[in-house]
Amino acid sequence: MNKIKVGFFSFTEITDPKEHHAYNEWHQLDHMPEQFPLPGIARGDRWVSTPACRRARAVSAPLLDPIHYVTLYLMTEPLDDTLRDFVDLGGALRELGRFHLHRRGLMGGAFYRVKEYASPRVLVSAESIPARPQRGVYITVQDVSPD
């Protein structure tokens, strides 16, 4: 049974092209490390959508096109406490001036884990995929709620 219950995604645009280096430095050395002490944060990863990746996207849409980075925090129980602490920490860091200002969140939020898959060639269980090193991801986001 997979202990990961939720993935909190953030799809981010950097609004000033000169700010990518500063954003990466802030995110890797300040913002992301602050999340890991929170109970319920199991893992965090961030991926860049390079120009080549953007050209290879299966879908183009006004909301998706500007996305430069996707961040994912994997969360375990207790979900209510974890999500509250996660949001509270973001607000506290922002109040301290520790939030990158040249960014725009285009989409994001907590999404329940529905199913995981692993190719037979990788020889690991599907449940272990979040812990396996990777060089990239292919993300699909679907609304599975009833109309």
Annotate each language-model stretch with its function.
Residues M1-D147:
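Macromolecular interaction modules
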